[in-house]
């Protein structure tokens, strides 16, 4: 497995975010990168997770020749400052746009393939709202567009009040049981002892997340990009059927749906025999890298 380089990405508001970087066949010389890089991949993790969960697929993409940037979202993973907090949906989108700019600068590629896992699928989809962003394709991995699990109604009222009075007040993420992510013993043990796993987010973050949901309903009005949807049969976090119906209704140029039998939410954690990582690398490899 190809180990990533650990880097810091400085955002326009001064926040420094940790990230994993695999140059693939790209180099730091932009001209050489254009000649050699197979493409560029921005990899977005979920609400609780961080880049370490997805190093296997990041490494495999790099071994296939892609330059891969896998940031830890502000307030999550290796980022200790402002744990669980985001000021607004606009700030989250600005961060992602800045990641894309950095990836294009490092790789020399014009377009960017975006992979969004779980909650990261919501952020990935919202990048299409910004018509100027060079999204070449979209891989949605068990995306959190239609969750089964939600905050209780009474808790939502407290979130709404806190968003006005105390936006940094923390609330539990309602998917804290490791068994919701995987049934693989090795990874269950990992999740139980993962010190970087995010278990709470602020009222401000929850409000920002809710605002990102709006584009899911409006996505059919966007010309779209090639998209692949990867689902787990036994997902306890997202509604697979609603997600499938949503994708099939999109008038986008290319849509693919793959569901893995007996699999659980975090496909990365499935035991040997699951072809998810191979399928992800293969599908991205068939997409044009120009947006």
Language model region names:
Residues 256-291:
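Catalytic active-site module of serine/aspartate enzymes centered on a nucleophile-bearing elbow/loop
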Residues 223, 229-231, 235:
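Short beta-strand/loop motif that positions the catalytic acidic residue
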Residues 117-202:
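Alpha/beta-hydrolase-fold enzymes
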């Amino acid at each position: 497995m190809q180990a990533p380089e650990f880097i810091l990405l400085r955002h326009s508001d001064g926040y420094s975010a940790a990230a994993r970087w695999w140059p693939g066949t790209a180099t730091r010389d932009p001209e050489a990168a254009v000649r050699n890089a197979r493409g560029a991949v921005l990899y977005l993790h979920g609400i609780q997770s961080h880049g370490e969960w997805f190093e296997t697929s990041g490494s495999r993409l790099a071994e296939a020749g892609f330059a891969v940037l896998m940031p830890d979202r502000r307030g999550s993973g290796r980022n200790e400052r402002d744990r669980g907090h985001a000021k607004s949906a606009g700030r989250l989108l600005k961060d992602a746009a800045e990641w894309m700019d950095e990836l294009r600068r490092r790789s020399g590629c014009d377009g960017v393939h975006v992979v969004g896992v779980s909650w990261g699928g919501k952020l990935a989809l919202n990048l299409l709202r910004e018509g100027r962003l060079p999204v070449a394709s979209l891989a949605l991995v068990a995306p959190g567009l239609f969750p089964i699990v939600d905050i209780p109604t009474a808790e939502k009222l407290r979130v709404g009040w806190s968003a006005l009075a105390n936006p940094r007040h923390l609330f539990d993420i309602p998917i804290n049981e490791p068994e919701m992510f995987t049934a693989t013993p090795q990874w269950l043990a990992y999740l139980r002892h993962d010190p970087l796993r995010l278990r709470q987010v602020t009222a401000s973050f929850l409000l920002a997340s809710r605002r990102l949901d709006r584009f899911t309903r409006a996505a059919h009005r966007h010309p779209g990009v090639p998209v692949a949807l990867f689902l787990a049969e036994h997902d306890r976090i997202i509604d697979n059927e609603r997600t499938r119906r949503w994708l099939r209704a999109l008038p986008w140029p290319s849509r693919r749906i793959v569901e893995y039998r007996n699999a659980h939410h975090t496909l990365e954690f499935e035991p040997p025999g699951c072809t998810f990582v191979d399928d992800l690398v293969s599908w991205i490899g068939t997409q044009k890298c120009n947006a």
